[in-house]
């Protein structure tokens, strides 16, 4: 069985598919990467070249997978940074194909819209992202994205949980808040939270002063792997949080400007410190 991963790809660096594909393969998964955007490196470094993959090319690649019968063994679709609104239609078609071809196929939507109070996608992508979140089985927003998708204020732990419930009511059975520092989050830490039905968990992790590119992409991939393995949301939260934190810790030590994913790959299946989530509902 395979995972179709539809998101950005870099020539150098580890965000989007450049992070997710390797992580999933290292964890033993077959992955089919479909790039929405091809860039030389992360735009935050300046001078990035490349751009969105033409929609007709994405469509033809998807059709090629269909002709090979690929969706009869596609257990999950993972989507991230779209780069253009039209790519949302490709994702929607892929999800429909996977669900038709493989009963029980799962769709995880990482709704990449922005962070730290600002968008880094065009406004034309916001509405299609609402639609994708509504058809997802699992959605993994950061705090900013949760606020956008739910329309709720996300400033405290209780507000975050309420916003997750609002978003859940619009479609996705599982909502995972990938990073949150609220007014009541303990100092020098961050929260990762998950909601599955009425059950909720919170994982409090030591924070970092360094900003990382690709941390959310890595978390979403590892969470999907862990969830597929056990179908246990609380356990998947602990595994994904622990593995991602371990990689970030390895990256922060030398203050590297890209995730040291290759150097720390051994931490993905076996992080040195395992954090356990707290059941909060």
Q: What role is predicted for each listed range?
A:
Residues 1-116, 263-278:
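Conserved N-terminal subdomain of the carbohydrate kinase-like
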Residues 11, 200-213:
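Short pre-catalytic strand/loop immediately N-terminal to key active-site residues, enriched for Gly-Thr
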Residues 20-23, 220-227, 240, 244:
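Buried hydrophobic packing segments
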Residues 29, 63-71, 96, 100, ...:
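Generic secondary-structure signature for well-ordered alpha-helical cores
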Residues 120-200, 231-234:
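Conserved phosphate/ATP/ADP-binding segment of small-molecule kinases
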Residues 147-148, 210-237:
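Short, small-residue alpha-helix embedded
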Residues 234-281:
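Charged C-terminal helix
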């Amino acid at each position: 069985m395979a995972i179709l991963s539809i998101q950005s790809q870099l020539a150098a660096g580890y965000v989007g598919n450049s992070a997710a594909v390797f992580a999933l393969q290292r964890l033993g998964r077959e992955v089919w990467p479909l790039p929405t955007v091809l860039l030389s490196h992360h735009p935050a470094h300046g001078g990035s070249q490349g751009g969105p993959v033409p929609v007709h090319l994405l469509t033809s690649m998807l059709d090629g997978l269909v002709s090979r019968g690929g969706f009869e063994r596609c257990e999950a679709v993972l989507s991230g940074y779209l780069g253009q609104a039209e790519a949302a239609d490709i994702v929607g078609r892929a999800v429909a194909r996977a669900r038709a071809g493989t009963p029980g196929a799962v769709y995880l939507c990482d709704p990449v819209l922005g962070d730290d109070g600002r968008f880094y996608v065009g406004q034309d992508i916001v509405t299609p992202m609402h639609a994708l979140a509504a058809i997802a089985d699992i959605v993994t927003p950061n705090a900013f994205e949760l606020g956008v998708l739910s329309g709720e204020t996300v400033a405290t732990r209780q507000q975050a949980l309420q916003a997750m419930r609002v978003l859940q009511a619009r479609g996705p059975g599982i909502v995972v808040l990938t990073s949150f520092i609220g007014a009541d989050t303990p100092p020098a830490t961050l929260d990762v939270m998950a909601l599955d039905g009425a059950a909720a968990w919170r994982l409090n992790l030591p924070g970092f002063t360094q900003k990382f590119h690709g941390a959310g992409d890595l978390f979403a991939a590892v969470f999907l792997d862990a969830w597929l393995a056990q179908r246990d949301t609380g356990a998947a939260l602990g595994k994904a949080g622990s593995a991602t934190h371990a990689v970030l810790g390895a990256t922060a030590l030398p203050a590297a400007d890209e995730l040291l994913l290759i150097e720390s790959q051994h931490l993905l299946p076996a992080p040195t410190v395992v954090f356990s989530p707290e059941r909060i509902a």
